[in-house]
Swiss-Prot record:
The gene is psaB. The PsaA/B heterodimer binds the P700 chlorophyll special pair and subsequent electron acceptors. PSI consists of a core antenna complex that captures photons, and an electron transfer chain that converts photonic excitation into a charge separation. The cyanobacterial PSI reaction center is composed of one copy each of PsaA,B,C,D,E,F,I,J,K,L,M and X, and forms trimeric complexes. One of its GO terms (molecular function) is chlorophyll binding. GO terms for cellular component: photosystem I; plasma membrane-derived thylakoid membrane. It comes from the Bacteria. Divinyl chlorophyll a B1 binds at H669. It comes from Prochlorococcus marinus (strain MIT 9313). GO terms for biological process: photosynthesis. This is Photosystem I P700 chlorophyll a apoprotein A2. PROSITE patterns: PHOTOSYSTEM_I_PSAAB. Its EC number is 1.97.1.12.
């Protein structure tokens, strides 16, 4: 007898309605809720999924390598990276006739192709790849790695090769392994690749499988390393006249501290990058020997955290705390076990760190690009900034989601009595109300300033605008070396201690050249009143998103309205039998509502980055400076003017190479708008609609020959909200992604 889906939940499998299908899909990855799941089995299944996850990433990379080698123009681009447009892949069947076929036959191709805006060409070129053959070899190597990963995932599900629960919970061993092996060795291995392959290639010296054992990466070999003369590796760096990829102006240094960027490639010096990675690798390997594992020496997390409490004789705060709260606190008692026994807590921390890193990458690629010539490919820069910022917001929302699930499923009040977690829960009203106050202050003041400026400009008196200079941010820029503001502080003052110390460092250094370059090159662009206002607008969005997420997590166990909320789970429905008036207070609902704010916030942040850079790249900073101080300036001079190019991708006079982006822009709007239908209409609407359709179906000839076993039941409100927020997010991303790429490409290619 065939088992009905889902096999992991007999309760759901026996549900006679369509709820069986949707709830089955919703809980497919919620391993904890599956029938017969033990803690050990849970860890083992998750461990195996890591191998699958890595395999998917590997297949993606291999697919990119293969398709660019097959259908791209990598070798032509390598010969002239500043003038040849990189091709992502061919378009096999361009619809809609000869017009679009001609429009998309671009970048020197003989057939319709897509232009590559992912930066992959720049990455592969920078790390030393030069030919299609090398791309094919890379794809094959990664495919072999993927096969090993898939085998490893399968193997670790077999009875003899399943790790034990104790192995998973040995936090010290895991930390040592992650620090020393995963971060330490891989950083040093990457330094090895840069020193042995990428840096020689950047100097016109090919290094491949045929000669990598015979080509010395440095004229003196390992002698300086073993004699302690490490400074030799920093001597004779590439000159400012170095032509990237050739020996012209090339030096011999492999580990430098030059600062700034390579004048021709616009990217960080490769020798600086190799120095960065070897330093991180060494620190990580030292860090990977800190925790007690095999030899009974080193730290344990439990001792560290238990020592951080005001009962401990060595705690410096014990007296002060007693005076303030009237009793001894147990700051970190129980925290180690709480984290070590909660996968949701660990995942929340990991997502928060990775989300922050993704946002950092977005900024880093614009301010300090590491790939050769990517700084001059403006469309790619804009696309990658947008891409990484959107990734960051979803990871951060996920961090708080799993924090909330931790409080519902894993938090033990007894084990955490009077420690820092318990205190956060006890003082949540103060935390939430303060955040609320900050949001209102930011929102009312920022909007009021914008609206005031809009009104006075509309009445023809722009001189009456309230324009606030961001003096604190300018102070930070000046402290880092920007001299245009006339603030003589730290590096902006040639006689300050940091400036004198920097001047005393041996060799040449180029940080000051970069920070004081023209706006389209400088990593610290000049800022003024428009930046001040949009900064506070973005701060409003960030604080409101944080407020919704933090409130959702801290109220996940219970609130004044619903003290026993934890008993209802993470995403309780509010449209079935049960408690009324609780529709917006599950922890899931907070994530759902925060996603809208997160999308709004990241749109504002990306609008800001994109418009300011468009102005800088076009040599017209005045447009941004004058128009960004009022809302109509943003609507008219950024959104409307840049949308016009995309909307022109389809018109009565024919089509152009922006047409695919134009259709994506339109389709994205439609998907986005569809979301509102699900967000506004609640369960009764869908149930009536479904019953009407069922009635019509059962009374229509031919159609009524097809029946179903599951009784059609409408979406719950939670499900409708999920469908709604998914359409909203996907539509938002498609619309803005198409906007960023098309509006930038129409100006710069």
């Amino acid at each position: 007898m065939a088992t009905k889906f889902p096999s992991f939940s007999q309760g759901l499998a026996q549900d006679p309605t369509t709820r069986r299908i949707w709830y089955g899909i919703a809980t497919a990855h919620d391993f904890e809720s599956h029938d017969g799941m033990t803690e050990e089995r849970l860890y083992q299944k998750l461990f195996s999924t890591h191998f699958g996850h890595l395999a998917v990433i590997g297949l993606w990379v291999a697919g990119n390598l293969f398709h660019i080698a097959w259908q791209g123009n990598f070798e032509q681009w390598v010969a002239d990276p500043q003038n040849v447009q990189p091709i992502a892949h061919a378009i096999w069947d361009p619809h809609f006739g000869q017009g679009i076929t001609d429009a998309l036959t671009q970048a020197g191709a003989s057939r319709p192709v897509n232009i590559c805006y992912s930066g992959l060409y720049h990455w592969w070129y920078t790390i030393g790849m030069r030919t299609n053959t090398e791309l094919y070899q890379g794809a094959i190597f990664i495919d072999i790695l993927v096969a090993w990963l898939l085998f490893g995932g399968w193997l670790h599900l077999q009875p003899k090769f399943r790790p034990s629960l104790a192995w998973f919970k040995n936090a010290e061993a895991m930390m040592n392994h992650h620090l020393a092996v995963l971060f330490g060795f891989t950083n040093i291995a990457w330094t090895g690749h840069l020193v042995h392959v990428a840096i020689p290639e950047s100097r016109g010296q090919h290094v491949g499988w045929d000669n990598f054992l015979t080509v010395l990466p440095h004229p003196e070999g390992l002698t300086p390393f073993f004699t302690g003369n490490w400074g030799a590796y920093a001597q004779n760096p590439d000159s400012l006249n170095h032509a990237f990829g050739t020996s012209e102006g090339a030096g011999t240094a492999i580990l430098t501290f030059l600062g700034g960027v390579h004048p021709q490639s616009g990217a960080l010096w490769l020798t600086d990058i190799s120095h960065h990675h070897i330093a991180i690798g060494v620190f990580m390997i030292i860090g990977g020997h800190m925790y007690r594992n095999s030899f009974g020496i080193g730290h344990t997390f439990k001792e560290i955290t238990d020592g951080h409490n005001t009962n401990h004789p060595n705690d410096p705060h014990k007296d002060g705390f007693r005076e303030k709260i009237g009793h001894y606190g147990l700051n970190h008692n129980g925290i180690t076990d709480t984290i070590n026994n909660s996968l949701h807590f660990q995942l929340g921390l990991a997502l928060a760190c990775l989300g922050t890193a993704a946002s950092l990458v977005a900024h880093h690629m614009g301010a300090l690009p590491s790939y050769a010539f990517i700084a001059q490919d403006y469309t790619t820069q804009a696309a990658l900034y947008t891409h990484h910022q959107y990734i960051a917001i979803f990871l951060m929302c996920g961090a708080f989601s799993h924090g909330a699930i931790f409080f519902v499923r894993d938090y033990d009040p007894e084990a955490n009595k009077d420690n820092v977690l318990a205190r956060v829960l006890e003082t949540k009203e103060a935390l939430i109300s303060h955040l609320s106050w900050v949001c209102m202050l930011l929102g009312f003041h920022t909007l009021a300033l914008y609206l005031h400026n809009d009104v006075v400009i509309a009445f023809g008196t722009p001189e009456k605008q309230i324009l606030v200079e961001p003096i604190f941010a300018q102070f930070i820029q000046a402290a880092s070396g920007k001299v245009m503001y006339g603030l003589d502080v730290l590096l902006a003052n040639a006689n300050s201690a940091p400036s004198l110390a920097a001047a005393g460092m041996p060799g040449d250094h180029y940080w000051m050249d970069l920070i004081n370059a023209s706006p389209e090159v400088s990593n610290f662009m000049p800022i003024g009143p428009g930046d001040f206002l949009v900064h506070h607008g973005i701060a409003l969005g960030l604080h409101t998103t944080a407020l919704i997420l933090i409130k959702g997590a801290l109220d996940a166990r219970g609130s004044k309205l619903m003290p026993d909320k934890k008993d209802f789970g993470y995403a309780f429905a509010c449209d079935g039998p049960g408690r009324g008036g609780t529709c917006d207070i599950s922890a899931w609902d907070s994530t759902y509502m925060a996603i809208f704010w997160a999308l709004n916030t990241i749109a504002w942040a990306t609008y800001y980055w994109h418009w300011k850079h468009l102005a800088a790249w076009q040599g017209n900073m005045a447009q941004f400076n004058e128009s960004s101080t009022h809302l109509m300036g943003w609507f008219r001079d950024y959104l409307w003017i840049n949308s016009s190019q995309i909307i022109n991708g389809y018109n009565p006079f024919g089509i152009n190479n922006l047409s695919p982006w134009a259709y994506m822009f339109l389709a994205g709007h439609l998907v986005w708008a569809t979301g509102f239908m699900f967000l506004i209409s609640w369960r009764g609407y869908w149930q009536e609609l479904i019953e009407t359709l069922v009635w019509a179906h059962q009374r229509s000839p031919i159609a009524n020959l097809v029946g179903w076993r599951d009784k059609p039941v409408a979406l719950s409100i939670v499900q409708a909200r999920l469908v709604g927020v998914t359409h909203f997010a996907v539509g938002n991303i498609f619309t803005f992604g198409a906007f960023v790429i098309a509006s930038t490409a129409s100006k710069f290619g």
